[in-house]
Each structure stands twice: as C-alpha cells, then as structure tokens.
C-alpha cells in the first residue's frame, strides 16, 4: 500500500527487553508438554535415563537462534576491527632493526603463530578442551615414577637379547647357502655322467665330440680369464679403416659446405647486380623522357618566335610565374599520395622553367 497504507505501530515500552514471549505459559507447546506430564521448571527427557545426572540448568533455558544473513561458516564472526593486520610483520621488522638474534625472533614469531592458530580454531569450532582418551574410555592410570624406573633396566636386557638371535639367523643363512651349493654340484655331476654315457654309445663320433668339448672348454676359460677382448691385428686394421673412413667423411662434408657457401655468395652477387641494373635502367628512362620533353618544347618555342611579329622586349618576371596559356602544354599534377610525389613536383617545375623564356634568361644569366 505504500504511504497510503495502514500504519501498525508497536510500542516496546511495556516489554523493552522482549522477554514477554519467553514468560508466556499459554502457548501451544506449553499445553502439549503439560498434557505429557511436564511441569514448568522440570527438565526435558526421561528422568530415569543413564545421562540424567548430567542435566543442568541449561536444559531448562530456551534454545537461542540467530539469523544467518551472510555466507560465512557456522560460528564464524566478522572482523570488527579488533585485530590490526600486519602488526606482527612490523614488529618482526623492528626486532631485526634493533639487532635481535635470529633465535629470539623465531621464538616471538612462533608465539604469534600459536596465537593466530588458537584464534582461528576458536572462531571456526569454538572453545575446545582436549581430554585424554583413557579418561573417556574409563581406563585407570596405574603407572608411577617408581615403576618407570624399574622398567628401564628391563628394556636394556631386551636390547641385549636380540644379539644371539642375530647370530643364529646368520648361521641359518650360511647353512642354506651350503645346501644350495651342494645341490648345484650334484646336478653338474649328473649332467657330466649323462654326457659320458652318450659319448660311449656313439662310437663313430667320439673324436668329433671330444674336439667340440675341448673347444667349448677353451672358449669358457678364455672368457673367464680375460673379460675384455684383446686387440688383434685384424681389429686394429678395422679400427684404422673406420677412422680413415670417418676422416674421409669429414673432408667430404667440409667440401660440400664450401661449395654451398660459394653458391650462396654467387646468388647474392647476382641479386645485387640485377638490382643495380634495374635501378640504372629506371634512372635512364626517367632522364630520357625529361630530355625529350625539353627538346620538343624548345623547338616549338623557336618556331613560334620566328612566325610571331617583333614585339616589345619581355619584361622580367619571377621564376615562380605560371606557365603561358598559349603553349598548349600542361604538366600533370598527381592528385593522390604516391611514391614519387616530390619527384613529380620537381619535374613539373623544370618543365615550367623551360617553357618560360624569361625564366630561362634568368637561369642562364642572359640580359635581354
């Protein structure tokens, strides 16, 4: 309705603290609780419950509800300007300037960090009191300082006990290794017996098999004695050939690089020569056009002077005078911006000077 609507005013003079609603006993909830056997001043819940002994006056007070009108977490409080941000860093800087030791500065910084952490925990989770787990479960603490002193020598005895155990474990490992070696020797003997039996059965190929066995034994002994192969003359020759081939390859690569450099230099020279030729041709064409125009204009001027009647001597004029109207020639003036705009202006001025006889007399310093 806006300003034209009915105005409902509430006066708080009768209830300035707004506690009338909490003292009202005629509400719907009060009636239901009384119907269930509850009376004002009693606790909620079963009277014979196991946790009834923990009930306090807090169970009789009202549940306080606050309106959450921000996006902060539950229990978070806004910064009302109580904390001065950057003060700890400033104090650290002052301590360094005053010549405090690093240990003292670290201790002060640790205290500041602990205070910050406690404030953060208090804002985030509220007040927290840590209790030992034994008390929560119901354990009983029986340990005393005398018992701790008695337990210390027992620990030394237990530390001495593992030494013989370690010796026994070493003996067992040695026995296992000896058993494994015996098994390997037995297997080798069996294999050698089988080979001998096969050699006796094959009468015709006894000599060949013996020679093969001897060769294989020689190869094994040579491989065991010398781990690295000896350098024979053949291997030395092969190494020399490989080195020579590598050197030849290097020389070939160098020659190829030189040829490439020469080709690149020639190409660059050819490009420069072509550019110079083009520039010279352009300059010659421009100069030829200018000379041709000037010659034709002079011829026409002489013909006109011969045919025209003798008149009074021409009055001297400025070099900047316009072109004569009767010449019949006009210099084209470029309208747009071009690359040779300044050049074209210079050429036009030259043409105007050649067309005007008075200007030519002034240029060649001839008195008429």
From Swiss-Prot:
Biased composition (Basic and acidic residues): 176-186
Compositionally biased spans, kind Basic residues: 187-196, 257-277
Keyword Cytoplasm belongs to the record: no
Localization per Swiss-Prot or TrEMBL: Nucleus, Nucleolus
Keyword vocabulary terms for this entry: Nucleus, Ribosome biogenesis, rRNA processing
One cellular component term from this protein's GO annotations in UniProt: nucleolus
S-S bonds: none
Bias kind Polar residues: ranges: 15-24
Composition-biased stretches (Low complexity): 310-337
Domain G-patch: 25-79
Gene Ontology BP annotations: rRNA processing
GO MF, one example: nucleic acid binding
Region annotation Disordered: where it falls in the sequence: 1-24, 144-337
Function in brief: Involved in rRNA-processing at A0, A1 and A2 sites and negatively regulates telomerase.
Similarity comment text for this entry: Belongs to the PINX1 family.
Name of the protein: Protein PXR1
């Amino acid at each position: 309705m806006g300003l034209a609507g009915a105005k409902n005013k509430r006066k708080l003079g009768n209830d300035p603290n707004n506690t009338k609603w909490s003292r009202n006993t005629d509400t719907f909830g009060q009636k239901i609780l009384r119907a269930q056997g509850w009376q004002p001043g009693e606790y909620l819940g079963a009277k014979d419950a196991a946790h009834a002994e923990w009930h306090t006056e807090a169970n009789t007070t009202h549940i306080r509800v606050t309106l959450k009108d921000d996006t902060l977490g539950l229990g978070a409080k806004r910064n009302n300007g109580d904390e001065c941000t950057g003060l700890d860093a400033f104090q650290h800087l002052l301590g360094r300037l005053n010549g405090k030791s690093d240990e003292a500065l670290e201790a002060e910084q640790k205290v500041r960090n602990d205070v910050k952490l406690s404030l953060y925990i208090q804002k985030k989770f509220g007040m927290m009191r840590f209790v030992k787990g034994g008390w929560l479960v119901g354990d009983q603490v029986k340990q005393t300082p005398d018992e701790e002193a008695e337990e210390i020598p027992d620990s030394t005895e237990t530390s001495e006990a593992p030494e013989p155990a370690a010796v026994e474990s070493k003996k067992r490992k040695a026995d296992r290794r000896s058993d494994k070696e015996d098994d390997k020797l037995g297997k080798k003997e069996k294999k050698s017996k089988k080979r001998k039996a096969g050699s006796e059965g094959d009468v015709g190929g006894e000599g060949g098999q013996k020679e093969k066995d001897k060769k294989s034994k020689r190869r094994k002994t040579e491989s065991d004695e010398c781990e690295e192969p000896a350098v024979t003359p053949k291997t030395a020759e092969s190494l020399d050939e490989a080195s020579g081939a590598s050197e030849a390859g290097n020389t070939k690569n160098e020659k190829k690089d030189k040829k490439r450099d020469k080709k690149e230099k020639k190409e660059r020279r050819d490009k420069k020569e072509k550019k110079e030729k083009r520039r010279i041709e352009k300059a010659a064409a421009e100069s030829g056009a200018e000379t041709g125009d000037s010659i034709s204009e002079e011829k026409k001027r002489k013909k006109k002077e011969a045919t025209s009647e003798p008149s009074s001597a021409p009055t001297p004029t400025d070099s900047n005078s316009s072109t004569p109207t009767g010449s019949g020639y006009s210099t084209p003036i470029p309208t747009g911006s071009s690359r040779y705009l300044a050049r074209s202006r210079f050429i036009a001025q030259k043409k105007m000077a050649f067309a005007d006889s008075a200007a030519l007399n002034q240029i060649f310093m001839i008195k008429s």
